[in-house]
Amino acid sequence: MIQYTSTGKKSYTQCVFLEKEGADYRVSKSFGEMLKNEEFYKSLEEIVEFGISRYKENYSRRYQDTDLVLYQKYTYEDACRLLKWEHNEVPLNIGGYKYDKKTKTFPVFINYDKQEDISDTTKYEDHFTSYNRLIAISKSGRSIESEDVQNFLKAKERGIDVQLFVRKNKDDKISKEFYYLGRMMPTGMAKEFVMPNTNKTAVEIEWALDTPVREDIYKYIVNG
């Protein structure tokens, strides 16, 4: 059974539209009474129609065999759900990337612009070198032989699906979501190094994106 929890769930705990009835559900008594109001019913109908229209326009053209749409924006929770993970993961547990053994999916989440006041062990110099090439850094304290790094480098032979999500800045006031940029595979270029001002090692990996980043999004992310 897939289970998800979020702050959004807490916000809407008082909005009960359905109630459990045996093995099925029925419209809640309070919501049923509201539906008798013609003005409310019409407004609700318009909202539902708008939602369906927006879905068809923005989310119906799925990327390859995924439930994701290229260049649309997703939260961590959205990504976990659409990649069919059994449980949602909080951002702290993901920490830039996380491998799900059951689905063999390995989403990578990149904050392109790093804050100046973060610790040296989290100042990863992830950067695009072209529209379809990315240099990404592993978590600190990793070597070439680390399991997560090996899963990246041997993704093809292990059947691991690496997916890329990028946002310009984690404190972006406009959106807390990541642009979905599709699948990527390692080019074979990887090197271990010691992170500046620390004694921690990390691994730099070059990636080839399956689909080059759309020009307007690329310029928005890369340009300061």
Model feature map: region roles:
Residues 68-177:
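Acidic, glycine-rich low-complexity segments with interspersed aromatic residues
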Residues 8, 22, 32, 51, ...:
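Residue-identity detector for glycine
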Residues 4, 28, 137, 178, ...:
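Compositionally biased, low-complexity repeat tracts
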Residues 5, 9, 24, 28, ...:
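Short, structured coil/loop segments at alpha-helix boundaries
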Residues 1-92, 98-101:
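Catalytic cores and motor modules of nucleic-acid processing enzymes
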Residues 171-224:
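Compact mixed alphabeta submodule
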Residues 9, 17, 22, 30, ...:
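Short linear sequence elements within intrinsically disordered, low-complexity coil regions
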